[in-house]
């Protein structure tokens, strides 16, 4: 950074939560020219007619006034619908389990928002994500946040070199308790505000009820691979591979799990046992590849991977099939690898990039999760 902090404009995305509030506070204390932006991505009026976005924006206003920075609200509802929510529905329609947070970061927070910030004269954008950016060996590297429990690089795996070059993560070196403490000491209005969880556009609503508003449910048969009927399902879109709860299968013996889907015949396949081999894969084909790092210029390399958020790192070999596809060979079989979810690659603390899980194999045989 060649400019002095006071000459450097940073536009920060503020959600009305404690993380982005403290991120804004830190930037202001470091002397940057800070502007707070509240992104309205969804019309989220709840069942009681209360718009939670309005409440969140009021918290942003209060915090920005406390810190002493200007603020604006920007409406990205159309972009969010077109780029994130439509994708979300398409994936569920195809029987997969999508991760809208990854797409939101790629298309909204680090694209639409970044473009808007640059129009405001921003040198950088910032967010309250738990991640770090470092410039080393001629490229920008995205590193895990130091708080292992909160690290969010999994959701940021599609960011490009260009996006990272204009991004700051003020919370990357901090742990959550420190952030709460800073907010309390500064008297910020959001200091004790509960963290948001789940998918942002669903909020506190029932997932089945929400999804049925957009995709008509198609109940069908729940059966074993040998054809023994075990009950009925409410609609394939409501179940994910490895799911136990909500199947409603009683009886003695090991618990039952969802092990596959047949979209053509609308069948949910189930079987018993947490360690059932039908739930384990050792080879994955993943598409929609995005690379943060230049390491991917190699045709084959070893690294670790996460196949879902908060999962422990797994040793893998990545083979580049083409610019959009990779084959992943796992050192050990991994449970419940789920089509539609993100697989994210790491070299130590560095996030190399990620892709969308498409096909899963075990000992060379394709697991027909989406038969």
UniProtKB/Swiss-Prot annotation:
GO cellular component terms attached to this protein's record: cytoplasm
Alphabetically ordered keywords of this record: ATP-binding, Cytoplasm, Disulfide bond, Nucleotide-binding, RNA-binding, Transferase, tRNA processing, tRNA-binding
Positions of the UniProt region annotated as Interaction with tRNA: 150-152, 308-309
InterPro entries in UniProt: MnmA-like, MnmA-like_C, MnmA-like_central, MnmA-like_central_sf, Rossmann-like_a/b/a_fold
Disulphide bridges: 104-200
Site (Interaction with tRNA): 129, 341
Superkingdom of the source species: Bacteria
Gene Ontology BP annotations: tRNA wobble position uridine thiolation
PANTHER family (UniProt xref): MITOCHONDRIAL TRNA-SPECIFIC 2-THIOURIDYLASE 1, TRNA 5-METHYLAMINOMETHYL-2-THIOURIDYLATE -METHYLTRANSFERASE
Protein name (record): tRNA-specific 2-thiouridylase MnmA
Gene symbol of the encoding locus: mnmA
